[in-house]
From Swiss-Prot:
Protein's UniProt name: GTPase Obg
Organism: Bacillus cereus (strain AH187)
Record carries keyword Transmembrane helix: no
Protein function: An essential GTPase which binds GTP, GDP and possibly (p)ppGpp with moderate affinity, with high nucleotide exchange rates and a fairly low GTP hydrolysis rate. Plays a role in control of the cell cycle, stress response, ribosome biogenesis and in those bacteria that undergo differentiation, in morphogenesis control.
Assembly and binders: Monomer.
Binding sites annotated in the UniProt record for Mg(2+): 172, 192
Obg domain boundaries: 1-158
Limits of the OCT domain: 350-428
Amino acid sequence: MFVDQVKIYVKGGDGGNGMVAYRREKYVPKGGPAGGDGGKGADVVFVVEEGLRTLMDFRYQRHFKADRGQHGMSKGQHGRKSEDLIVKVPPGTVVKDEKTGQILADLVTHGQTAVIAKGGRGGRGNSRFATATNPAPEIAENGEPGQERDVILELKVLADVGLVGFPSVGKSTLLSVVSSARPKIAEYHFTTIVPNLGVVETGDNRSFVMADLPGLIEGAHAGVGLGHQFLRHIERTRVIVHVIDMSGLEGRDPYEDYVTINNELKEYNLRLTERPQVVVANKMDMPDAEENLQAFKEKVGDEVKIFPISAVTRQGVRDLLFEVANLIETTPEFPIHEVADESDTSVMYKFDTEGVKFEITRESDGTFVISGYDIEKTFKMTDFSRDESVRRFARQMRGMGIDEALRARGAKDGDIVKILEYEFEFID
């Protein structure tokens, strides 16, 4: 089974906690603070592995959580940074943020990497907070939380050639004849619901990958039937082989099929029409095929080169493969997203934290709820088991303008204020 889209959860490792410690050595009566910083949490890094062909492995493991950094230690020793969590993906994987739809990475070449979830920085130890007025601070930070998100992985088939055409025109049969692929073949529509890949050898030391793509019907660009699944897989192909049934047994007109398929390709993505297209008249071994072919040629004109074949008897297949191989050699790849520096195999990760620093809402019971990236991060990095840390957090809230905003919303002494799952009283 070919899995081409899957949703997974990734979380960068939390930073290690900073430590509160003091030098306790003989002959050093006033050693001062010596708590080390926590280590950085591990990133979740996606790496392209050319040996992979599907996203099947992600059906069995959908959660990837990187290790947190080591906690700070005494004697000013910093915690160790955790090793990044490496997640291998097949070439052609597009990674999207499930919430925003933003494309985080388009991974094509072997060894290409992208950081999908950043690990948090380590919390600072108490030696970082020493000042002239507070030479022995009882204060240290918790590690910064690692970023977490749900992402959608989409696999684009990295085939050189894509077979397109209406269902049951003989695409699966053709692929099985010219390669070692063994797609399921039957005489009903939508037999092929996932792409089948096959390596084709032309006999003159040339080879290419051909994909028998899911059947296409009118309205595919709008998502009708299997449309979007089909069109996602054809975006990366360099040559399109358009297979048309000349037998007439399905009751459809070959020319109307030809026009409909091309309209769908044009509607979905204009760049699809830039690819060279080879028109294949299949099922020429059937009784009315020759007559239908002549009528088809009259309608399309002389500018369209047509290859009459029979996938069953292999008539004309050899000439078709030579033509396709020639086109591949002269046709460049069509990347979906332009890359500024093709020599760089890494993807720059940008995490936008701009926006509202905090937001205050009020629940039906009168509780004030404070939310926002900055305040929640500050809250998580505060060690509430130490009084100095609590006082520092209160100062940080005042500095962000939260106290003033609460008063403006009508908060009074004793009112309940909630951040994440924690509650405390407002003191004016």
